Amino acid sequence: HLNVRRQRQMCIRDRPSIAQQLIASDIVKKISITGSSRVGKLILKQAADKVQRVTMELSGHSPFIVFDDADIKKAADMAIAAKFRNNGQVCISPNRFYIHERKKDEFVNLFIEKTKKLKIGDGMDPSTQLGPLTTKKRLNEIEELVEKTKEEGAKVLLGGKRPLSLIHI
């Protein structure tokens, strides 16, 4: 006998009224949110009225740390998997990399080499490893971030521009 729990995952953006209705519903048994602290506080207040179970991951800024005794090939493989899962649009996707000075060059070279091999394309194509971002707004934010960091002195080691063959609709 299998105990299968039904789950529904919804991505709700800019729709407070929908979230309020879902939280108030007797159908919803648990709320899980990944998002900002501001939105988390609002949802927690609404859920408190029903003493609703809530799990939150708020405002994550996950570091990826590589010490001097690390297996660099394994660390690079793990970094690629963590950073590019769902195009980095995951709350636990690393935003900062701290690499021991003695391992930095080797790690960076491996990371670039492995990133070059990732297939960018249509998210519906099973062979695609990097598909589209969730919204055009997010795409613009990332392009602005790249430009800002370059202006502040960052050096782009790979890419830095959207592939011309891909169009965001």
Name every feature range the model reports, one short phrase each.
Residues R13-K29:
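A structured beta-alpha segment of the ubiquitous adenosine-cofactor-binding alpha/beta core
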